[in-house]
Amino acid sequence: SVVLLICLLLLGQVDGSPVPEKSSVKKRLRRMTPFWRGVSLRPIGASCRDDSECITRLCKKRRCSLSVAQE
């Protein structure tokens, strides 16, 4: 009977423990080192988000471009 009482108390503690909110937990993005940034540069025609991702350093219309005037 004492064991049952202890188990019930422990279950009550687990059930009542606070759960961290997902909105307060932010996932930190890892930054690439200069070595990996250079190794992972994208070729002409590959999709991109900004100039730093392309081997030519030109991202136009979400594609790695060869020149600024290229459409």
From Swiss-Prot:
Chief place of localization: secreted
InterPro entries (alphabetical)? LEAP-2
Name the UniProt key words of this record, in alphabetical order: Antibiotic, Antimicrobial, Cleavage on pair of basic residues, Disulfide bond, Secreted, Signal
Q: From which residue to which does the signal peptide run?
A: 1-16
The biological process GO terms on file are: antimicrobial humoral immune response mediated by antimicrobial peptide; defense response to bacterium
Annotated propeptide span(s) = 17-31
**Disulfide bridges in this chain:** C48-C59, C54-C64
Is the keyword Ribonucleoprotein in the record?
A: no
Cellular component (GO) terms are:
extracellular region
What are the subcellular locations of this protein? Answer: Secreted
- Keyword Secreted listed? The answer is yes
Give the family per the record. Belongs to the LEAP2 family.
Q: What does this protein do?
A: Has an antimicrobial activity.
Protein name per the record: Liver-expressed antimicrobial peptide 2
What species is this protein from?
Cavia porcellus (Guinea pig)
> Quick one: which gene encodes this?
LEAP2
